[in-house]
Amino acid sequence: MASPFSGALQLTDLDDFIGPSQECIKPVKVEKRAGSGVAKIRIEDDGSYFQINQDGGTRRLEKAKVSLNDCLACSGCITSAETVLITQQSHEELKKVLDANKMAAPSQQRLVVVSVSPQSRASLAARFQLNPTDTARKLTSFFKKIGVHFVFDTAFSRHFSLLESQREFVRRFRGQADCRQALPLLASACPGWICYAEKTHGSFILPHISTARSPQQVMGSLVKDFFAQQQHLTPDKIYHVTVMPCYDKKLEASRPDFFNQEHQTRDVDCVLTTGEVFRLLEEEGVSLPDLEPAPLDSLCSGASAEEPTSHRGGGSGGYLEHVFRHAARELFGIHVAEVTYKPLRNKDFQEVTLEKEGQVLLHFAMAYGFRNIQNLVQRLKRGRCPYHYVEVMACPSGCLNGGGQLQAPDRPSRELLQHVERLYGMVRAEAPEDAPGVQELYTHWLQGTDSECAGRLLHTQYHAVEKASTGLGIRW
C-alpha cells in the first residue's frame, strides 16, 4: 500500500525508509532491584510476556511502546510511525472524546473545536458536487450534529502566518549584510519539508527557514490561548481538531515545540485528513448535501464568519505572492498589481522577479515536490542559489494535491486536481492586512506586532537531528 506521507518524508535517503525491526529503537531506563537475581521470561499464546522470579512469582511485563514523539526525535524511518498516527490521531479518537462528553457531567466535559483548512473544504466540495461556501456550512452542521461545539476556518489563522512571513522577510532583507544566512528565506508552512530539512540537512539549512508558524499551529495558539481565555477555560479543557489535506500535519501537531508543559496539552490535539472526515461521514451515515447549512463560527467579534475566505497566490497559502507584494511595496515603494510566474524545468518550479530599469530587485521562486526541493538544496550548498525567497512544499502541485485529499477512482487525478483548484479559487480572497479582527487581535491579544507575546505564539524553532550510528545499520 502506498504511504500517505509526502515524498520528502519517504525519500529522504535509502536509510531513512527502513523497517522498525532494524533501527527503530527507543532508549529506556531499566530499574534494577537489589537482590532480584536472575529471572526467566515466559511468552503466552496471546503474545504477552511474564517474568518468572526465582521464588516462583510472576509479573506481567509491559510491551515497549514507541510514541510519535520518539519517531520525531529519531533519525531513522518516518513512515513506520503510520500505525502510531492511526491510533493517536484519527477520527476514532475524536469519536472517543465526543462519546466521553455525552457520558460526563457538564463540568467534566471538554469543549471540542474543529478547524477546517480551505484545501480540505475544496476537496470535499469536489466529491459532493457542492460549492465551497455550502460545503463549509454543511460541514459545520455535520460536526455540530455529532457533538462539536465550534467550527473555525484556518484561513483566519493563515492571515497571521502570512503577515509574520512578510515582516520576517523584510527584516532579513534589510539585515542581509550582517548575516550570511539571512537569505534566501524558505517558507515553513509544510511539515514534510521541515522534517526533511531537520533530518537530512540540519544546521546548514535550518537558519534559512522562516520561523513563522504554519496556519495549523497559529490556529493552535488562537484556540488554546486566545479562545480559551474568552471561554474562561484552561487549554487542557479544550480538545482541538484540525482537518488538513496532508498526513504530515499529524507530525507537525505532535512536535514538542507545540506542547504546553504547564497544562499538559497540545496546541492541536488531533489532525484529521480530508479522507478521514469522509470516512467519518460514511460511518455516521450522513450525506453532506442532505444536511441543512449552519452559520460559520468566528473566533472574535471583529471577524466576519458569513462566508469562508481564502488568499491569493495558489492552493498552498499564497506565501510567495503575499511576501513578494509586501516586500515590493515596503522595500522599494512599488505596487505590484499582478504577479507573473515564469515556469522553469516543470510547472512545480517557477520564478517571480521584480525589476526596475533593468535591475533585478527581488528574485522569488516556488519549489514543489521532492525533486525540486533537492535541486534547491543542492544549489544552496554550492552557493549558487539566486533567490531571496522560496515557497517550498513537499507535495507535487502543492497542498491541494496532499496525500490526505480525496481521490476519485473513476476520474483521472489531473482532471480532479484541476477541478479542486477551480473550487478553491471560487472563494473570496482577502488581504491579511485588511482582514476583520486581525489587527484587533494583534493589539489586544498579542500586545503588538513585534511583541514577545507575538514571537512566542506565532513563531517556532527547528532542531537538527543527528543520525544515530548503530551496528544494526550495517549493510552486509
UniProtKB/Swiss-Prot annotation:
Widely expressed. GO terms for molecular function: 4 iron, 4 sulfur cluster binding; metal ion binding. The gene is CIAO3. Pfam families: Fe_hyd_lg_C, Fe_hyd_SSU. It comes from Homo sapiens (Human). Keywords: 4Fe-4S, Acetylation, Iron, Iron-sulfur, Metal-binding. One of its GO terms (cellular component) is cytosolic [4Fe-4S] assembly targeting complex. Transmembrane segments: none annotated. The keyword Acetylation applies. The modification N-acetylalanine is found at A2. It comes from the Eukaryota. GO terms for biological process: hematopoietic progenitor cell differentiation; intracellular oxygen homeostasis; iron-sulfur cluster assembly; regulation of gene expression; response to hypoxia. Component of the cytosolic iron-sulfur protein assembly (CIA) complex, a multiprotein complex that mediates the incorporation of iron-sulfur cluster into extramitochondrial Fe/S proteins. Seems to negatively regulate the level of HIF1A expression, although this effect could be indirect. This is Cytosolic iron-sulfur assembly component 3. External component of the CIA complex. In the CIA complex, interacts directly with CIAO1 and MMS19. Gene3D superfamilies: 3.40.50.1780, Fe-only Hydrogenase (Larger Subunit), Chain L, domain 3. [4Fe-4S] cluster 2 binds at C190, C246, C395, C399. [4Fe-4S] cluster 1 binds at C24, C71, C74, C77. Belongs to the NARF family.
